[in-house]
Design a protein with these regions (language model features):
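Glycine-rich, often proline-containing surface loops adjacent to acidic residues and nearby aromatics
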Residues: 129-133, 147, 189-198, 243-246
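Short strand->helix junction
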Residues: 141-144, 158, 202-204, 289
Length: 312
């Protein structure tokens, strides 16, 4: 209050590059979205989004990502981005009855999954192949920088295991104990050599939390390697070779890749390399050249400077 338009504009411009501002100001309803887009959404689109909201479908899009849209209708083709933000009639119709798109992602206590793997209780570890398993932490990594309409884990948003209520996703005290148990699964398996930390989105975890997760992975890799030194030839376990972080934030929220995060990635690479890990990868999902902005390019440069690779 009391600020001129120019003063407000300068203040928002100063906040724009802070990922916390972007998350705090994210659009969460159809009416907010239409207002942000200057009332450019059709009545059919608004009806569909309102129907989705009534069915409990979450909506979440940051000002940064929405700024990539063309609201004039006379500029460039932004259909690729709109397809990520706006839900299809088919998705809205089936929401509430969605099951796991991959049968292997169905985890039942005490029973092997469809790929034959017996997994720890809960929904933290998923596995389809002998050499790789997915880790989904009980942290803010169960959220995303936006909800992709094509998300393969839409059933997890449906069950609210994944959501955008950030305060409820902050790790509880018991998470540290649970993380140790989950690391035991990787350590005691003879074939696993690749861990993919995802969600949600791996980079949505707070820096302190992500550091703790990576340090737990590093300690596990070291223990597994030392145990192997005591095993005879022919009985050695696969050692951890690759660590991947699944994240769309370089496209959705590139300002999340700040200096502190880069230092965490660099420190982990140095420590994990000493215990035999050879590949460090951010696995992202750029879907259109419209997402390759100056901010995204800077985020990629920072990640590469930490010695990590980018795959898309």
């Amino acid at each position: 209050d009391g600020m001129t338009y120019e003063e407000k504009y300068r203040q928002v411009a100063a906040w724009w590059g802070d990922f916390r501002f972007q998350l705090a100001m994210a659009v969460k309803s159809p009416s907010e979205l239409n207002r942000f887009l200057a009332g450019s959404l059709s009545s059919e689109t608004m009806y569909l989004l309102s129907k989705a909201r009534k069915k409990g479908m979450p909506f979440f899009a940051t000002p940064y990502y929405l700024s990539l849209l063309d609201v004039t209708g006379g500029g460039y083709d932004d259909a690729a981005i709109r397809s990520y933000i706006l839900y299809s009639p088919q998705l809205v119709e089936t929401y509430g009855q969605i099951r796991a798109w991959e049968r292997e992602d169905v985890v039942e206590a005490g029973r092997p999954n469809a790929a034959g793997w017996l997994l720890p209780d809960g929904h933290n570890i998923h596995r389809r192949y002998p050499e790789v398993a997915i880790l989904i932490p009980d942290t803010m990594g169960r959220a995303c920088g936006g909800l992709c309409a094509s998300c393969q884990r839409m059933y997890d948003f449906q069950s609210e295991r994944l959501n955008f209520e950030f305060e409820t996703l902050r790790p509880k005290e018991s998470w540290d104990h649970k993380l140790r148990r989950l690391m035991n699964y990787f350590e005691e398996d003879a074939q696993l050599r690749d861990i993919l930390i995802t969600g949600g989105d791996a980079l949505m975890s707070q820096n302190k939390t992500l550091r703790n997760i990576l340090e737990a992975v590093c300690r596990m890799a070291g223990r597994k390697r030392r145990a192997n030194a005591r095993r005879p030839d022919g009985e050695k376990y696969a050692e951890l070779q690759r660590v991947r972080l699944g994240s769309r934030l370089p496209a959705y929220l590139p300002m999340r890749v700040n200096d502190e995060l880069v230092e965490i990635l660099r420190e982990f690479r140095e420590k994990a390399s000493a215990v035999g890990v050879k590949q460090f990868i951010i696995q992202t999902h750029f879907q259109t050249p419209l997402e390759v902005t100056p901010e995204a390019e800077e985020a990629i440069r920072k990640i590469l400077s930490a010695g990590w690779l980018i795959t898309n």
